[in-house]
Swiss-Prot record:
Protein name per Swiss-Prot or TrEMBL: Probable receptor-like protein kinase At5g39030
Record: residues binding ATP: 504-512, 526
TM helices/strands, residue ranges: 444-464
Residue ranges of every copy of the Protein kinase domain listed in the record: 498-775
Membrane topology reported for the UniProt record: Single-pass type I membrane protein
Record-linked SMART domains: S_TKc
Keyword Iron-sulfur applies: no
Catalytic residues, chain numbering: 621 (proton acceptor)
């Protein structure tokens, strides 16, 4: 029976892996009037039907044909006719939910209507995404390498039900387009990761995630070592793979590999890349003495736009080698290590099995607006491979949207797209079965019967294998941490804490114990509970804390990762957490200068996390329990279990779950109606923390006098006190004028920080400036309210920095 199941399973995998992709949606629109339906490849193009045109199409546009055909190589379809726009013009395409290829065809020349594309500039949007801004097709083709007279711009956009494509001519200009192509793609084709379902985040220890609100632009797609692969020879998505013979390559040889037998798999189906791509490659050469290859790299240079993140997909295939450790090399992107050990045979499981890996890298503007993204392959010698060689078959590079904008970096925050589908995705299923034993596979098969049971068995088995792979990836990260930090055994922690006898704190995460190292230094040891998700929290905390070094950030001294035992060792802080301090020291909590010093230190710590680290760290759980105080009442931010790492230029984050603590969690984290989640979420939590520090004692008094106050939104009556100028009594009758101004300044800063719309909140840079500056320089903020309208989200007040750095 088991053999039969495995046979059928392998048959299903084989069929699905080798089957070509058939897109659900295909639109080929030849814009303007034409009687020629077929292009050079035999594909059928249609004219613009009324159902996709706007009602004002006659007034907003007109059609025209080229004055004369300048180049014999320019195809008749779709380049000889064009739709020319006088004003904003929106096509509406009914499509199924999911990501779509959008290809725009341009032939910048003169047209019989008198229109000359030389003077044409246009901005293009799809739903909430800006794809092009003040774009000139004429200037683009003149700067193209290799030289070309026509142009195709390819984008990948997520769409719910309707793809609204808008062309907006620039001032005193007309706009045009010759052809529009829309093609669907397999679910999460560019968002789930490579064959291993991972996107390696170059320069970070945390894998990158692409959510359903991310658009991209294809900037390079290469058939490495071979000729161009045109649309009809792709694997069903009509992609064009260019040769890498131009400025992309430095060094290497391109061997001829005839009659290649490619064994596609479920991990790398046939639609990932056509056989033409895996049939060609570039290698380093020097076959007689590969030791010479240690003197140089196999290198490509790709011109890209600065200020964006890029998804780099690399395709690999080994035909002639058949054992692991024959060819092992390292991959570098942007002069950073992307993968230390790349052994195609070891990863794929055998010869003639294609695989592909995904990497994400941010390209800054240090080298100008159009820098080169460098890709290097170099032999790895430490494992003593049989050949000192490297190989590459294909490259795809996608520019990822920056807060909804693929054209330029802008500050305004955009509304999120609706979800792609209400159906469960494989990720949802993984969450449901996480932590279950393998007996679940047998139970499901028996429960639903042999027919549907086999299909369910296959799906669950694949998901279980994916989960095991992610578990192995976490263990690989721990090995990396061992090189940077002290790693303690559980027995050593038991000795340090004297059998965990001294408890200094408890929480939902676990218990914190006091202890002493062998040199006498006091430490705190946080032992995590053995709960679902705690491994991910542990990885987050170690990864975040290992990158920090600041007086207002708790110092990580080491960790333990032993089976199910996980613990973090950090410096011991004598005064415990801020909430413990405030409950123990009522007299000190009335000292305005003490509270101000603590608040300013916390602000500086958050400023460092957002702007001082190489990789921005968003904490997501700022609250009194996570602020520790040393003997001098110097505050230190701690507990990074919910933290998220991202590049500093990324103003918008992707969250798969709600994270934070009620009372301090930013509204956009649990409801997208308030805006997009970003580092501004920490700003909100800081504001609530400051107001809590200033108003905690006042809140107790008010609730004693008026029980109805407990049901009032806390900042409401704080704001009323600020308006009435009666906040003195919070600290008693003996408060000085200077202390009164400090208290008022803290309240004003706190109220600015808790504005419901993230774009209205100051950055932590600005918060520190406000805290250190004078009260007179501060404006009174609008009254925060959780009941906001759409207009509030789209507007910004005088302290807004648009969701980005100031």
């Amino acid at each position: 029976m088991i053999c039969f199941i495995l046979f059928v399973f392998s048959f299903l995998v084989s069929v699905s892996a080798t089957a070509p992709y058939k897109p659900d949606d295909v639109f080929l629109i030849n814009c303007g009037e034409t009687d020629v339906p077929f292009d050079n490849h035999g594909r059928t193009w249609t004219q613009e039907e009324k159902n996709i045109l706007p009602k004002n199409s006659d007034n907003a546009s007109f059609s025209s044909v080229v004055s004369y055909k300048e180049e014999s190589g320019i195809p008749q379809v779709p380049y000889m006719t064009a739709r020319i726009f006088r004003s904003d013009f929106t096509y509406s395409f009914p499509v199924s939910p999911g990501w779509k290829f959008l290809r725009l065809y341009f032939y910048p020349t003169s047209y019989k209507s008198g229109f000359d594309a030389v003077n044409s500039f246009v901005s293009v949007t799809v739903n909430d995404f800006t794809l092009l801004q003040n774009f000139s097709a004429d200037l683009t083709v003149k700067a193209s390498i290799p030289e070309s007279k026509s142009l195709i711009k390819e984008f990948i956009v997520p769409v719910y039900l309707t793809l609204n494509l808008t062309f907006r001519p620039s001032n005193n200009s007309l706009a045009f387009v010759n052809g529009i192509e829309i093609v669907s793609m397999p679910d999460r084709f560019y968002s789930k990761g490579g064959f291993d379902d991972l996107i390696t985040n170059v320069g970070s220890l945390i894998d990158f995630e692409i959510d359903n609100s991310t658009a991209s632009e294809t900037v390079h797609r290469l058939n490495v070592g071979g000729h161009m692969v045109d649309e009809v020879n792709d694997s069903g998505m009509f992609r064009r793979w260019l040769s890498d013979d131009y400025e992309f390559l430095i060094g290497g040889v391109s061997p001829y590999m005839p009659d290649v037998n490619i064994s596609y798999t479920e991990k790398t189906p046939a639609y990932v890349a056509p056989a033409y791509v895996y049939s060609t490659c570039r290698m380093m050469g020097n076959a007689q003495d590969t030791y010479l290859n240690l003197n140089f790299n196999l290198t490509w240079l790709f011109t890209v736009d600065a200020g964006f993140s890029y998804l780099v997909r690399l395709h690999f295939f080994e035909k002639y080698l058949n054992k692991a450790n024959q060819r092992v090399f390292s991959i570098f992107l942007g002069n950073q290590m992307a993968r230390e050990e790349m052994d195609v045979i070891r990863l794929s499981g055998g010869p003639r099995i294609p695989i592909y890996l995904d990497f994400r890298i941010y390209v800054g503007s240090e080298s100008g607006p159009r820098p080169d993204l460098r890709l290097d392959l170099h032999p790895l010698v430490k494992d003593n491979p049989e050949y000192y060689e490297a190989i590459l078959n294909g490259v795809e590079i996608l520019k990822l949207n920056n807060s909804g904008n693929l054209a330029i970096i802008q500050d305004n925050e955009l509304k999120p797209n609706p979800p792609l589908s209400s159906n469960l995705t494989p990720n949802h299923v993984t969450q449901q079965i996480k932590g279950k034993s393998s007996h679940l596979l047998v139970k499901i098969f028996i429960a639903v019967g042999p027919g549907t049971g086999l299909a369910t068995f296959v799906v669950v088995l694949m998901l279980w294998m994916r989960q095991m792979k992610r578990k192995n990836r976490k263990e690989e990260r721990v090995v990396m941490f061992k090189k940077l930090l002290n790693m303690y055994t559980y027995a050593e922690l038991k000795k340090i804490t004297k059998s965990f006898s001294y408890i200094i704190g408890k929480g939902g995460f676990g218990t914190v114990y006091g202890g002493n190292l062998s040199n006498g230094r006091k430490v705190a040891v946080k032992v995590l509970k053995d709960l679902k998700g705690s491994a991910e929290d542990f990885i987050n905390e170690v990864a975040s804390m290992s990158q920090t070094s600041h007086v207002n950030i708790v110092s990580l001294l080491g960790f333990c990762f032993e089976g199910s035992k996980r613990a973090i060792v950090y410096e011991f802080l004598e005064n415990g957490s801020l909430d413990q301090f405030m409950s123990r020291n009522k007299s000190l909590t009335q000292d305005v200068t003490t509270l101000y010093g603590i608040a300013l230190g916390i602000a500086r710590g958050l400023e460092y996390l957002h702007y001082g680290c190489k990789t921005r760290i968003v904490h997501f759980d700022i609250k009194p329990q996570n602020i520790l105080l040393d003997g001098n009442l110097c505050p230190k931010v701690s507990d990074f279990g919910l933290a998220k790492l991202c590049e500093k230029r990324e103003s918008v984050l992707s969250l798969m779950d709600t994270r934070g603590t009620i009372g301090y969690i930013a509204p956009e984290v649990f409801s997208r109606m308030y805006g997009r989640v970003s580092h501004k979420s920490d700003v909100y939590s800081f504001g609530m923390l400051v107001i809590d520090m200033i108003g905690a004692r006042s809140k107790e008094i008010v609730e004693t006098v008026d029980s109805a106050a407990s049901s009032t939104y806390f900042p409401d009556w704080i704001y009323k006190d600020l308006e009435d100028g009666e906040q003195t009594w919070i600290f008693g009758d003996e408060i000085t004028k200077e202390e009164k101004e400090i208290a008022k300044k803290m309240i004003v800063v706190g109220l600015w920080c808790i504005q419901p719309c993230p774009s209205d909140r100051p950055s932590m840079n600005r918060v520190v400036e406000m805290m250190e500056g004078s009260l007179d320089a501060l404006e009174i903020p609008p009254k925060p309210s959780m009941h906001i309208s759409t207009e509030v989200i789209t507007e910004s007040s005088s302290l807004s920095d648009g969701g980005e750095d100031v």
